[in-house]
Swiss-Prot record:
Gene Ontology MF term list: ATP binding; cysteine-tRNA ligase activity; zinc ion binding
SMART domains in alphabetical order: DALR_2 (SM00840)
Source domain of life: Bacteria
Binding residues annotated for Zn(2+), in chain numbering: 29, 211, 236, 240
Upper lineage: Bacteria, Bacillati, Actinomycetota, Actinomycetes, Micrococcales
Binding-site list for ATP: 270
This protein's record includes keyword Nucleotide-binding: yes
Name of the protein: Cysteine--tRNA ligase
Reaction(s) the record says it catalyses: tRNA(Cys) + L-cysteine + ATP = L-cysteinyl-tRNA(Cys) + AMP + diphosphate
Cell compartments where the protein resides: Cytoplasm
Length: 474
């Protein structure tokens, strides 16, 4: 089956055909590092991490670009309010984003360009647009993109100009209210360090210009996939496409957008004040549980983020990790070389078909859980060969989702909380006493100890390699 992806531009699921056979270029709009990362930020990065993993598992060479917007009006305002240099404020929060992305197991991008490191490319693109008649100089060093100069403006979101919301900043300097800033002239009170010299005067780049210039720098005039949150479609992505098309570039061939994380049915966002920071979420559950909660829902469906969502994800993850751990103890892991061997695992056809169907993770997880059921049956009956085969398939599928319990960084994650650690110690102590009773052929005491554990919800399974235990319902 050919990989099919939902293209937001055509509003249809399309066969994915790379621009260059065997290679894929992806540009993902990264963070504007104005504050702490929240759960919504993690959802977007995890969704595209799964895409990258699947493309690579399918044999494609992926170049993944995820930018950092480290110069922005909000960064300047918040840093000034805090009495901190804008660049220090941006860098501090950039590190917080990177740490959060790493914590939930995302692969690093091929390149992670900062906007401030690519101002030269932005000025060159801006000059090109002015020369081609698509941009004009306003007052005070501002440079505006002329939306009426581009016939297909609005094509990404299928809007006519007269019906569009005016979300760009108001200014008497503009020829049309919908025109947007390519460059913002230095204003009184702005820090001199947050500006660069151009033929049009000193200032700083507009948000939309930044992404077009960085995408061109790393992926060229035309590339395969542009991604981001659904809230970026307009005006950001519409304006990115407009700039790049006006410059004569093909830009993105497929547009992918992930849905929101919601709280109480509303988008989780800083502006609404209903968000949970990444640090707060990671303080509630292990990082792998948070990843499972965000990755287990189709990327185009919203995730309602509640305590029940996290609790369900925790139970499911512990069931997954429990099987993998028990099976690996009996049969050994897939191989000592870990990732290399997992990449060679033949994945179940139904799993492949689900992932090729616009990354249908929900259907893929149904296949995963069926193989875990078969694996548990094999373990119970002592069929080591069948258990090993199921372990191989399960770990291969989990690797695609970034959820393999035996891979970094998840080794030991299922028992990482202090409570689970304490339970481990107590249960292992009782099992040691039971083992001693069995060795002494004190069957009554051995049975009593097992009943004691059962009353506490701990299920004990005896096997040739010793007793294994799980918590009932996990």
């Amino acid at each position: 089956m050919t990989l099919r992806l939902y293209d937001s531009a055509t509003r249809a699921v399309r066969d994915f055909e790379p621009l260059e056979p065997g290679k894929v270029g992806i540009y993902l709009c990264g963070a504007t590092v104005q504050g702490e990362p929240h759960v919504g930020h993690l959802r977007s990065v995890i969704a595209f991490d799964v895409l990258v993993r699947w493309l690579r598992r399918s044999g494609l060479d992926v170049t993944m670009i995820r930018n950092v917007t480290d110069i922005d009006d909000k960064i300047l305002a918040k840093s000034a309010e805090a009495g901190v240099p804008w660049w220090a404020w941006a860098y501090r929060h950039e590190r917080a984003f990177s740490d959060a992305y790493d914590a939930v197991g995302n692969l690093p991008p091929t390149y992670e360009p900062r906007a401030t490191g690519h101002v030269v490319e932005m000025i060159e693109l801006m000059q090109r647009l002015v020369d081609r008649g698509n941009a004009y100089r306003g007052k005070d060093g501002n440079v505006w993109f002329d939306v009426r100069s581009l016939a297909d403006y609005g094509s990404l979101t299928r809007q006519k100009l007269e019906n569009m919301s005016t979300l760009e900043e108001e200014s008497s300097d503009k020829a049309d209210p919908h025109d947007f800033a390519l460059w913002k002239g230095l204003k009184p009170g702005d820090p001199e360090t947050a500006s660069w010299e151009t033929p049009f005067g000193r200032g700083r780049p507009g948000w939309h210009l930044e992404c077009s210039a960085m995408a061109y720098r790393y992926l060229g005039e035309t590339f395969d996939i542009h991604g981001g949150g659904i809230d970026l479609r307009f005006p950001h992505h519409e304006n990115e496409q407009a700039q790049s098309h006006a410059a004569g570039y093909g830009f993105a061939r497929y547009w992918l957008h992930n849905a929101w994380v919601t709280a109480g049915g509303e988008k989780m966002s800083k502006s609404l004040g209903n968000y949970l920071t990444a640090a707060e979420a990671l303080g509630r559950v292990p990082a792998v549980v948070l990843r499972y909660a965000l990755a287990s829902v189709h990327y185009r469906s919203s995730v309602e983020f509640t305590e029940a969502t996290l609790a369900e994800a925790r139970v499911t993850w512990e069931r997954i990790a429990g099987f993998v751990t028990r099976a690996a103890e009996l049969t050994g892991p897939v191989g000592d070389d870990g990732a290399a061997r997992l990449a060679d695992v033949v994945l179940p056809i139904a799993f492949v078909e689900a992932m090729d169907d616009d990354l249908n993770v929900s259907a893929a997880l149904a296949v995963l859980h069926e193989h875990i059921r078969l694996g548990n049956t094999a373990l119970s009956s002592g069929e080591a060969g069948d258990a090993a085969a199921e372990l191989s398939a399960v770990r291969g599928m989990l690797d695609v989702l970034g959820l393999d319990p035996l891979a970094e960084p998840w080794v030991g994650e299922a028992s990482a909380t202090p409570l689970r650690g304490a339970v481990d110690v107590l249960v292992e102590g009782v099992l040691a006493d039971r083992s001693a009773a069995r060795a002494a052929k004190d069957w009554a005491r051995a049975d009593a100890l097992r009943d004691q554990l059962a009353a506490a919800g701990v299920v004990v399974e005896d096997s040739p390699s010793g007793a294994r235990w799980t918590i009932k319902g996990t």
